[in-house]
């Protein structure tokens, strides 16, 4: 997908990886970039507008833990204004295994709810035009960081959901792929809580190993958007972009 002249909704587009990705997206010249986030950042919004004044950038406050009905109401406002949306990026995430319910609500249920809400406008069975979803998951969904099992499980669930969305594309007209960053230098990973304090130094231990910058991750994210491969499971790690082959151990035969 060429980003130029497209309409894009980016949930959590002002976060660590999110903000650098928004910068890279704006450089590619979309028509509209609509950022949905919990907290407005006027300085960041102004910076994005300055990068490419031809791009219309709009911010709406949004908490992914609201109901599907509330999400649908906000999306209707956006669709009424833009008429069409080409790409939805679900990027909300937290890393704190003390907060079990909120981790699941943000990292998994929030992605499901926002996706469910946009189907009202995209699903071809309802006369919609289809669309593309990029879900930011994590390499911990492949192999867990066992000291943060709640976070890792929430990301594994998000990957599984995304894989199912991709297989449903012939029915819904909506394609999907997952973006799975490795350990990236963001505020998220500098300090976080392990489950039941099984490893108080988990953040320090992770950062002793090779990481990547948010810019490297963002640049590869844009490459994945441009590749636009339905069902792709992208690994963005150590400055590289690699497609992962998912191993199938069971088949439902339906």
From Swiss-Prot:
It comes from the Eukaryota. GO terms for biological process: alcohol metabolic process. SUPFAM superfamilies: NAD(P)-binding Rossmann-fold domains (SSF51735). GO terms for cellular component: cytoplasm. Its EC number is 1.1.1.1. One of its GO terms (molecular function) is alcohol dehydrogenase (NAD+) activity. NAD(+) binds at residues 10-33. It is an enzyme of class 1 (oxidoreductase). Keywords: NAD, Oxidoreductase. The keyword Oxidoreductase applies. The active site is at 151 (proton acceptor). Substrate binds at residue 138. It catalyses: a primary alcohol + NAD(+) = an aldehyde + NADH + H(+); a secondary alcohol + NAD(+) = a ketone + NADH + H(+). Belongs to the short-chain dehydrogenases/reductases (SDR) family. Homodimer. This is Alcohol dehydrogenase 1. The lineage of its organism: Eukaryota, Metazoa, Ecdysozoa, Arthropoda, Hexapoda.
């Amino acid at each position: 997908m060429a980003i130029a002249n497209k309409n894009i909704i980016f949930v959590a587009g002002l976060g660590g990886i999110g903000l650098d990705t928004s910068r890279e997206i704006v450089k590619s010249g979309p028509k509209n970039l609509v950022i949905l986030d919990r907290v407005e950042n006027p300085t960041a919004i102004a910076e994005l507008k300055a990068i490419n004044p031809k791009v219309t950038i709009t911010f709406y406050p949004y908490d992914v833990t609201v109901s599907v009905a509330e999400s649908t109401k906000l999306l209707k406002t956006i669709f009424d204004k833009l008429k069409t949306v080409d790409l939805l990026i679900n990027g909300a995430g937290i890393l704190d295994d003390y907060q079990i319910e909120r981790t699941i609500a943000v990292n998994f249920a929030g992605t499901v709810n926002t996706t469910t809400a946009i189907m009202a406008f995209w699903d071809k069975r309802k006369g919609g035009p289809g669309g593309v979803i990029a879900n930011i998951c994590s390499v911990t969904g492949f192999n867990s960081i066992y000291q943060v099992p709640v976070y890792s499980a929430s990301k594994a669930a998000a990957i599984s959901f995304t894989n199912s969305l991709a297989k449903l594309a012939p029915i819904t007209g909506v394609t999907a792929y997952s973006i799975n960053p490795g350990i990236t230098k963001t505020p998220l990973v500098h300090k976080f809580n392990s489950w039941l304090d099984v490893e108080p130094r988990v953040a320090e231990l992770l950062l002793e190993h090779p990481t990547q910058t948010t810019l490297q991750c963002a640049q590869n994210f844009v490459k994945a958007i441009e590749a636009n491969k339905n069902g792709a499971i992208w690994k963005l790690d150590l400055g590289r972009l690699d497609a992962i082959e998912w191993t199938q151990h069971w088949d439902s035969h339906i």
